[in-house]
Amino acid sequence: MRSSAGRTLAAVPTVAAAANGAAAIALATVLAPGVSLAYGPGNAGYIATHLVAWRAGWTLWILAALSLLAFFGWWAGRAGWTGMARVAVVVGALGVIADVTAEARLIAWSGDLDVSAALRQSGVVANACYSIAGALLMVATRGWPRLLATWGWAVWILGFGLSVAAAMSSDIGSQVLTAAIFVLFVPWLVAAGRWLS
């Protein structure tokens, strides 16, 4: 029988999937009208009249980032805490720092906030760090089944694409890539978590 600590650790991938799925739904619904890399008065007007939902949505994104870091740490443990796995966790932590500081600024929104800059920080810096961390952990983990490996690499490659789209201030590119990432990523967390367990 597993210890309570073992059961808690085994839940990390599922918790990360739930948190990231909830954040993605928030982005597609309550956050979407306020989110734009070409931020304008219409976006600001939406945020001002939906401030509670806006703040709750970005709080979900902070929880998603923290759960992703927990998943990276859990995954690194499964990969044997090799040097590459340790580097991956450090890079993932840098991504969380970039994400949380950007999202905290979005939560504390006021009319003069440069929302586009906060979105770029999250979209470019955090996503690049997460994608590097994920790629390093893919390499550090031996024996992936072909389907899970292809699926996982697709997630991290799309993550790099999202960083490029955000750097280019492409709302359409960012929206399409974000949707593709989360459609793949949330179930991959569960499937990879089961295999790694």
Please annotate each region the language model reported.
Residues 1-197:
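Hydrophobic, aromatic-enriched alpha-helical segments typical of multi-pass transmembrane helices
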